[in-house]
Amino acid sequence: MGFTDFVSDAGLSLANNYLATRSYIVGHAPSQADVVTYKAFTASPDAEKYPHVARWYKHIASYESEFPTLPGDASKAFTAYGPEGSEASANPKDKPAEEEEEEDLFASDSEDEDPAVVAERNKNLEEYKKKKAAKGPKPAAKSLVTLEVKPWDDETNLEELEANVRAIEMDGLVWGASKFVAVGFGIKKLQINLVVEDEKVSTDELQAQIEEDEDHVQSTDVAAMQKL
């Protein structure tokens, strides 16, 4: 299944999902795939409703004078490109985890219990809670995370990208060392270490906040995570 149209909401949403993690329709450089797709639009896409399509459309427009010289097959229809199979629909967001209830270590499945047994169990439970409270809070669990932040292309300003990443502040988050790693085609990605308090910082929320910098960031991945 490829692109369908760029007029209906369904068609534009399909394209927006496809371009959420891509700078170009095919590969890592502009080609005739971008040209035929660009020409299939009758108007500029709405940047508020379809931000990824709008960003791609604006970027490809800057190559308009080079359209005839870009590589690829100019005879293909735009419907030959786009998502395939499982890519055609957006992945549903993970449901929030249900709050864990404190396990009752002395519970019983029986509904008809001897009152004396119930009283004894409740007494044991209270003693358990008192001992647990007397021990005080446990040290905060922390993790060392290596995060990879991928830019759109080789023209992305990596210094600005890193500055925007480090500008994010959260209680329980400490940024560490970083470096730029080559991925090919002249493109480099940011690899940055950070320490998080597990109960305070969600890596999913942190990644989502980083990816809000749509001018610089294509996507993020957790490359490694280690409990401290």
From Swiss-Prot:
UniProt keyword list: Allergen, Elongation factor, IgE-binding protein, Protein biosynthesis
Gene3D superfamilies for this protein: 1.20.1050.130, 3.30.70.60
Signal sequence coordinates: none
Residue stretches of biased makeup (Acidic residues): 97-115
Recorded GO MF terms: guanyl-nucleotide exchange factor activity; IgE binding; translation elongation factor activity
GO CC field: cytosol; eukaryotic translation elongation factor 1 complex
Listed InterPro entries: eEF-1beta-like_sf (IPR036219), EF-1_beta_acid_region_euk (IPR018940), EF1B_bsu/dsu (IPR049720), EF1B_bsu/dsu_GNE (IPR014038), Glutathione-S-Trfase_C_sf (IPR036282), Transl_elong_EF1B/ribsomal_bS6 (IPR014717), Transl_elong_EF1B_B/D_CS (IPR001326)
Region (IgE-binding): 84-93
Region (Disordered): 74-116
Keyword Protein biosynthesis part of the UniProt annotation: yes
PROSITE patterns recorded: EF1BD_2 (PS00825)
Pfam families in the cross-refs: EF-1_beta_acid, EF1_GNE
Subunit structure, as described in the record: EF-1 is composed of 4 subunits: alpha, beta, delta, and gamma.
Family label: Belongs to the EF-1-beta/EF-1-delta family.
Function: EF-1-beta and EF-1-delta stimulate the exchange of GDP bound to EF-1-alpha to GTP.
Protein's UniProt name: Elongation factor 1-beta
Source organism of the structure: Penicillium citrinum
Taxonomic classification: Eukaryota, Fungi, Dikarya, Ascomycota, Pezizomycotina
